[in-house]
Amino acid sequence: MSEKKHAVNEPLFHLAKRTSISAPKAWLIRLAAIALGFLACGVVAFVLIEKLREKPEMIEDFYKCFIDGIWSEGKTLVKNRKLWKFLKNLAILQCISLAVTPAFRMKFWNIGAEGQTLVGILGSIAVAFYLLGSVPNWLLLVLMFVAAVISSIIWAIIPAIFKAVWNTNETLFTLMMNYVATFLVEYFLVIWVKNGSSTLGSLKFTELPSFYHDYFVIVLVALALSVILYIYLKHSKQGYEISVVGESVRTAQYSGINVKKVIIRTMVVSGLLCGVAAYLIAAGLDKTVTSTSVGGQGFTAIMVSWLAKFNPLVMTLVSFFITFLSRGAGEIATALRLNQSVSEIITGIILFFIIGSEFFINYQVTFHLPTRSRKKEVSE
C-alpha cells in the first residue's frame, strides 16, 4: 500500500448545534433579525414603490406608517380608534394562539384552530338566528356562549378521539377539518339567506357588556386567559401530564399516565379556548358569520405559539408584535395607495427574518478565513 498526501480544503463555514444559549444573547439575535427585517422591507419598498424612488425622503414616512397603524394623532385614549382596533385584533389572535398551545406542548399538532373557531362562531350565530326575539337578550348571550364552546369542543375532540384510539395523523386530520368547517358555514348560509346572496347581515341583539370602551372586555378576557393558561400548564397536575406526554409517550405510560385520556382532555381545553374566541367574534364584534370570519388567524396563531415557545405570557408579546406589523403594513398600503398584497409582502419579509433567527439561536455558525490547504495522509 502506498501512502499519498492529498490537499484538503477547510470549509468556508461550520455548523454546530448549540448545547445552550443565554437568554440575553438569544433575544439579541432576535432583535438583530427584526432590525434586518425592517431594513430589508425598506429596500424592497424602495424598489417596488415608484413614489419612494421619486421622493427618497418619503422613506421616513414609510416607517412612520407602522406607528400610524396603531395610533391616531390628536385622539384621546378612549377615542383612539386605531389603537382599539389594534388591541381588538391582538386579543382575538392571542385567544386563538392560547387555544393551540396545550396541544402543541403535548406534541399534538393541532392545525385546526381556524376551523374550530369558525364552527364555534357558526354555533353561536345559529342560536342567535333561531332564538333572537324569543328569549331575553341576556339569556341569548349566555346561550350563544354555550353553543360556541360546545361546537368548538366537538370539532376539536373528533381528531383527538381518532388520534387516541387509532393513532391517526392529527396534522392532516385537523387541517382537513378546516375545509369541512368552511363548507359547513357556506351550507348554512344558503339555508338561512333566501335571496341567494349567501351573506347574512349583522343580527340585532344586545352587545356584550362594555365599560371604558366596547373592546375593553375582549382585551380583558384575552389577558385573563393568558394568566389562567400559564398557571394551568406550569402549576397543575394536568399541565404536568401534558408535558410528560409531549416529552415521551412511553415514559408517560410507564409513569401510569392515561395517554388517551390526556390527549382527549387537552383537545377539550383547546376547543374550549377556541369557543371563547369564537364567542368574542360572534357576540362582541361581527354579529354574523361568513366563511372568512376567522380571517386566517387560526394559522397565524400557530406561528405565535411556536415563536413564544408555547409560553402563554410570552405569547402576548409575540401577538403584539405580529398585530403591530399587520396594522402597520395595512396603513402603508392605505397611505401610499398600494395594493393590499404589498402589505402582505412587507409583513412576510419581517416574519421570515424572525423565523430565520431561530436557526441561529439553535445553531452556531463558525466561519473560516481562506488559508493554505493542509495535507492529510490517506492510505491507499
Indicate residue ranges for each PLM-predicted region.
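Loop-to-transmembrane alpha-helix initiation sites
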Residues: 170-172, 214-221, 263, 293-297, ...
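Hydrophobic core segments of alpha-helical transmembrane domains in multi-pass membrane transport
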Residues: 30-46, 94-100, 121-127, 148-152, ...
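Cytosolic-side transmembrane-helix boundaries in multi-pass membrane proteins
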Residues: 1-37, 227, 247, 254-261, ...
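Membrane-interfacial amphipathic/re-entrant helices at transmembrane-helix boundaries
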Residues: 4-95
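Transmembrane helix-bundle core of multi-pass membrane transporters
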Residues: 170, 174-235, 288
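Transmembrane alpha-helical segments in multi-pass inner-membrane proteins
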Residues: 268, 274, 280, 284-348
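Helix-loop-helix "hairpin" substructures at the membrane interface of multi-pass membrane proteins
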Residues: 211-288, 312-313
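Single transmembrane alpha-helix segments in multi-pass membrane proteins
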Residues: 50, 70-131, 145, 149-168, ...
